[in-house]
Amino acid sequence: MAAKDGAKSQEDYKLKDMKPELGERWPHGGQRGGTGWIGSERAASTYDLVEQMFYLYVRVVKAKDLPPNPVTSNCDPYVEVKIGNYKGKTKHFEKRTNPEWNQVFAFSKDKVQSSTVEVFVRDKEMVTRDEYIGKVVFDMREVPTRVPPDSPLAPQWYRLEDRRGESKKRGEVMVAVWLGTQADEAFPDAWHSDASSVQGEGVQSVRSKVYVSPKLWYLRVNVIEAQDVEPSDRSQPPQAFVKVQVGNQILKTKLCPNKTTNPMWNEDLVFVAAEPFEEQFFLTVENKVTPAKDEVMGRLISPLSVFEKRLDHRAVHSKWYNLEKFGFGALEGDKRHELKFSSRIHLRVCLEGGYHVMDESTLYISDVKPTARQLWKSPIGILEVGILSAQGLSPMKTKDGKATTDPYCVAKYGQKWVRTRTIIDSSSPKWNEQYTWEVYDPCTVITLGVFDNCHLGGSEKSNSGAKVDSRIGKVRIRLSTLEADRIYTHSYPLLVLQTKGLKKMGEVQLAVRFTCLSLAHMIYLYGHPLLPKMHYLHPFTVNQLDSLRYQAMSIVAARLSRAEPPLRKENVEYMLDVDSHMWSMRRSKANFFRIVSVFAGLIAMSKWLGDVCYWKNPLTTILFHVLFFILICYPELILPTTFLYMFLIGLWNFRFRPRHPAHMDTKVSWAEAASPDELDEEFDTFPTSKGQDVVKMRYDRLRSVAGRIQMVVGDIATQGERFQALLSWRDPRATCLFVIFCLVAAMILYVTPFKIIALAGGMFWMRHPKFRSKMPSAPSNFFRKLPSKADCML
């Protein structure tokens, strides 16, 4: 029974094929045809990776000549659009008889049961019931159909009618009503009947939006030297260092080794800056008075926009900058710019445009272009993604005592982020939104995450209790694994690791197509570096890259959270894997078994050769002898045979090639085998928030694991040192024996043809077990007795 449950769960974690009805399907006469304005000669739609969803659009533009209220002599008008049980309202204007709203309402046609569309104009009353001004009624059967790229439907003026529709009243309203799809330009900013329960500021947070990451630059500051820097105590020469701050980033040079008023450093400090350059460049030269006290001797403040932009590896001219004496300006007010001190600093500062500023891991990078746009190459393809729907999403919060989920998707590729609209209170939402990206390198990854919206302005309470959008799951797709011009439609499992273990949160359905614009250019890219050339001409250290990536992620998260509606910090951090560098016992085990899997082929080959040598299958061993004789007699066939063999293996494996993109694999991730304590440790904060006993237990476990790794590394070092000891005379007798052996071997190899040597060595290696001894060989015994530096270890 347990085996069946395990097999079932493994099946749930796999990718599933789908066959959705993609493309346009219209209710009146087939695809792209029928009556009305839709002609059969129209070009193919760009929305061919999603299922068609029909909406009734009502655009309320403005009204004129509205009658005032007979009691207040004023008019505070608003418009209410009613279709069946669905109602949408515009905002009201105070004391306006000619208001302008220019608002669009979108009603899902699948949920519309009414045969009429009613547009009411009402007068807002603060105490009593809102006053009726008039209405306009449209017959659903007479509503025209509009499909992009048709021009927008022109709104028209309609006279208001009384309640019964028998007579006209004073006032007119300008309205346009049409039947369209999610491809309509009005769709993203329209009021949706699906989100009619959302009010106030929450309305903005449910709409679909496209975001662009800020343009990031590396700011390189080469601190060369300073002159005439004086501390407050002039009797003691300063031990100076430089501190530079850009935004929230602070870096320091090393202390000048000599105590002098003319210190030298020649040290590089690298920061991340984003356009538009809002932060100031703030530099101070400080004196290390005591280990706990620093004294500012001078400062420099400058906007980032004044620095030179470098696009290649050419040298940047250095400049001398005057330092302002710190503290004098604060005392003298406006005279601070006049009080220049004689000290100055020598800097070489530039904004690096030839690098790609990495805000994500290189393992699943989505953008490889340099910062400077003039260095970009032409795109080699187009990536189109249809975000169709989701199924079986787990409830993420409680609202009014009811478990519910308000899901939306976020997709990130390159500098472009997209966010779908939020589907209110649905565990099986249907988005059917399509997005497009330009592709500059096929060896990149698109990331898509599903979240629960907790910012709808209601009484939601997430399971964690915090007002953050909860993670439902994530999908990554590497573009190089996709066949060109093929549509992949699959249902991807949404898997999340929690402290209690692995949990499937549902499934998300995607349609993906990668279109190649230039096959020759794409093949050409496979032989070129992934990153721009500056990363290889002037590379950063590993520690620098980690720090700069974290700073870039922080800047991107801060900028996108200021958009309207905001793409929140928790979204950006989850998509960019901000915690991927944190220690995890589970990841360590997974990486170890990945290494084992990589060498599994070599291990299997070694085992097979051992079976051949020990004559486990005599026929195989005899055939191997024959092949060995042929290769010895005709050595020029060795390399052609090897490459021909790999060619045939590639052709054979073509039949079994993967038919679908890779997805989150629970076995590779070692997700199901992780213990609860290991998962609890993985999700612990940094620094830890656990109790002393728990930390002690985990520390001891880590020491045990590290001890085993230490033993393996020591054994590898020992074997290498024994090779070095062969000629080092550390063991004089062993080295003497080896030197004599080398001399004899040189003479034998000189007078004996190589084919004879190779044939004799091969026959000895494959000799029959009758001629083998169970004792270790003499060379092995000799090697094991060589000395190593393990004897010198404390």
UniProtKB/Swiss-Prot annotation:
Gene3D superfamilies: C2 domain. It comes from the Eukaryota. It is a multi-pass membrane protein. Ca(2+) 2 binds at residues 123, 125, 131. Disruption phenotype: Late flowering under long days. It is found in: Endoplasmic reticulum membrane; Cell junction, Plasmodesma. Ca(2+) 1 binds at residues 76, 123, 125. Its main location: endoplasmic reticulum. Involved in the export of FT from the phloem companion cells to the sieve elements through the plasmodesmata. Regulates flowering time under long days. May function as a signaling molecule by regulating the trafficking of other regulators. GO terms for cellular component: endoplasmic reticulum; endoplasmic reticulum membrane; plasmodesma; plasmodesmatal endoplasmic reticulum. Unlike other flowering promoters, overexpression of FTIP1 causes late flowering due to the deregulation of FT transport out of the phloem system. Residues 37-158, 198-321, 364-492 form the C2 domain. This is FT-interacting protein 1. Residues 1-27 have a biased composition (Basic and acidic residues). Belongs to the MCTP family. Keywords: Calcium, Cell junction, Endoplasmic reticulum, Flowering, Membrane, Metal-binding, Repeat, Transmembrane, Transmembrane helix. PROSITE patterns: C2. One of its GO terms (molecular function) is metal ion binding. GO terms for biological process: flower development; long-day photoperiodism, flowering; positive regulation of flower development; positive regulation of long-day photoperiodism, flowering; vegetative to reproductive phase transition of meristem. The keyword Protein biosynthesis does not apply. Residues 1-34 are annotated as: Disordered. The chain crosses the membrane at residues 510-532, 595-615, 619-639, 737-757. Its cofactor is Ca(2+). Induction: Up-regulated by APL/FE. Not regulated by photoperiod, circadian rhythm under long days, vernalization or gibberellin treatment. Expressed in the vascular tissues of roots, cotyledons and rosette leaves. Specifically located in the phloem including companion cells. Observed in flowers. Not detected in the shoot apical meristem. Interacts with FT in phloem companion cells.
